[in-house]
Each structure stands twice: as C-alpha cells, then as structure tokens.
Amino acid sequence: MKLVDEAEILVTAGNGGNGCVGFRREKFIPLGGPDGGDGGNGGSVWIVADENVNTLVDFRHERAFKAQRGENGMGRQAYGKGGEDRVIVVPVGTVVMNVQTDEIIGDMTQHGDRLLVAKGGKGGLGNMHFKSSVNRAPRQSTTGEEGEERLLKLELKLLADVGLLGFPNAGKSTLIRAVSAATPKVADYPFTTLYPNLGVVSVEAYRSFVIADVPGLIEGAADGAGLGTQFLRHLQRTRLLLHLVDISPMDGGVDGVSPVDQVRTIERELERHDPALLEKPRWLVLNKADLMFPEEAQAAAEAIVAELGWTAPWYLVSALGRDGTFPIMKDVMAFFDRQREDELEARNAG
C-alpha cells in the first residue's frame, strides 16, 4: 500500500448570521417595541480520527472544506438557525499543523479523537438588545462575525509495528514482499521505494503485525539528503526496527560502503534526527546471503557482528529466496507477545 502521507487543506468556518431589525406589529399594538432576533452562529470545522481510514489520498482531490453560514435573525425575536458543522475524517496517527505558524494543533492518536480546527463566527445581535430608556425604537443591529479560516498541513505517521531501515538496495522491499502480501516495486537502483509501503505479516491464524518498508537512508538523511527527513519520521511510532544490511561482496558493499559502515552511518542519522530512535529495539538482518557460498556468508556475518559489537538479535537471510525470513517473523511475533504480557502486568500492578 502506498501511503500519501502529507496534504495541505484550507478550512473555513461559517460566518455568523446577521441580527435583525424588527418591530412588534400586531392588531391594536401599532407602536410595538423592537423584536429583531439574533443571527445564528456559523458552523465550525472539525477533524475526526477514524481507524477505518488508512490514507490521506482523498485530499488530492478535495482541498477546501467550508462549514455552513448561520442564518440571519428574524422578527418576533426569532433567532437564526446555526450553520452545520463540517467534519473532516482522517486516519488515526494524523498530525495536524497550522501552515502559517508551523504550530502543531493536534495529534490524532486514537479512534474518535475530535479536533476543532476552525470555529464558526458568532451570530449578530438583533435590535431587541439595543432598547433603552432613551431609545425605545432602536434601528441598530450587528452583523455576524466571520468564521475562522486556516491553512492546515496533515501529516500521517505510520502506525506500523515494525519498521525496516537500511541503505538503498539493502533488500527491504524484497523482504516485505517475501513475508507479506504487499507488492512494492523492486529494482536494482537506489530509491526504488519512493513511498512508504505497509504489509500485514500473518504468522498464524489471528496473529499478525504490520510492517513498514520506508525508502532507503543514506548519509545526510537527517538533513534531507536522498529521501531524508520525509521518511525518517515514519520510524518514530514503530515498536521494533529491523536493520537490513547487504553483506554481498560486490564493490565491498552497497556503493562501496562496507556492511559495518552501512550500519554506523544509519545509526548516526537516526541519532541526529531523533536520539530516541536509537533506544528502540533494533535487530540486525544480514541480507543477500544467496550471493555467497553458505560458509562464506556465515563467516562474513559473524565477522560483521563481532566488529559492530552487536548484542541484540541478528539473522542471516536471503530475502529473494525467502531463506531465513520466516524465523524472523516468528521471533517478532513472540517479541510482541512478551511486550503485551509485560504491559498487562504493569497495568494490573498499577
């Protein structure tokens, strides 16, 4: 699934209705007092998170959202009807920002979250409010207030359980194709993956998790190099990172960068973008073992792990041949099971 993960929209609340200038006119009461009613309030614009919506793709086609104007007041102290609110539905995980101020207005983290993004204008006052001892027949009323208008940026952070990271061509798209139903484009050139891809990995009946394949990272990604910060943020809400490394001997690694340097380069970029990313559980996946003899691949993997001083889990796989990929997915599922058990125990203890 390709996620359109950013969108700009214009939201405009409804103006308030105008107050009415009116006078009571009934039989036998020729000089009745003022009875002009107030205008109705304008409708507001709300953003609501819905777990059944997965992307921001619809905002490619509709970018302007306007709530209804309040109706004008009427005679006999009749108030104008309030304008209807406009509701905009977004996926859970959407961050809403004010483009003019670059301020985060809200973070839609749960199904049903509601956020007021543009408040409707108040209705104007009818002339019945302006009657006084010196002005028994006021012809004064006020117009309704204008509704708020904002230019908003919607940003979707993936709510995936597992994030795949690595250099371009490390084999992330191939791995996600091997273990899920996702079918990202795969080719032997950098930045084949131009959008995040989501796949659902089913380990067994009723036991699954979501894995995100994000575009490859290179040195300078935290400054926007390559596909840069646009995709680093997709890793922030994952629970586990799988760090893919190409261990094939061609050119000494990817574009001449050794496997160890690939790992260290990306670690530096993660730390520069958000040091908390380095605190996440991260497992090492040494890929493309099929391009070497088994004994050579095993020896190379052990040498890489030793040089890195790697203490977390690591795996030697061929994503293309699907060799060694299923054990990783089983271990990931078991890791999440343990996490849930620990969270449940912590809640019960509290």
UniProtKB/Swiss-Prot annotation:
**InterPro entries in UniProt:** G_OBG, GTP-bd, GTP-bd_Obg/CgtA, GTP1-OBG_CS, GTP1_OBG_dom, GTP1_OBG_dom_sf, OBG_GTPase, P-loop_NTPase
Residues where Mg(2+) binds: S173, T193
> What are the Obg domain coordinates in residue numbering?
1-159
Task: Tell me the residue numbers annotated for binding GTP.
Answer: 166-173, 191-195, 213-216, 287-290, 318-320
Chief subcellular location: cytoplasm
Mind telling me which PROSITE patterns this protein's record contains?
A: G_OBG (PS51710), GTP1_OBG (PS00905), OBG (PS51883)
Q: Sorted alphabetically, which keywords does the UniProt record give? A: Cytoplasm, GTP-binding, Hydrolase, Magnesium, Metal-binding, Nucleotide-binding
Q: Any idea where this protein resides?
A: Cytoplasm
User: What's the short name of a Pfam family annotated to this entry?
Assistant: MMR_HSR1
Q: Name one GO molecular function term.
A: GTP binding
Signal peptide: which range, if any?
none
* A single Gene Ontology CC term: cytoplasm
The EC designation for this entry is: 3.6.5.-
Q: Which family does it belong to?
A: Belongs to the TRAFAC class OBG-HflX-like GTPase superfamily. OBG GTPase family.
Q: Tell me the protein's name.
A: GTPase Obg
Q: Which organism is it from?
A: Xanthomonas campestris pv. campestris (strain ATCC 33913 / DSM 3586 / NCPPB 528 / LMG 568 / P 25)
Q: In the record, what lineage is assigned to the organism producing the protein? A: Bacteria, Pseudomonadati, Pseudomonadota, Gammaproteobacteria, Lysobacterales
Per UniProt, what is the name of the gene that codes for the protein in this document?
obg
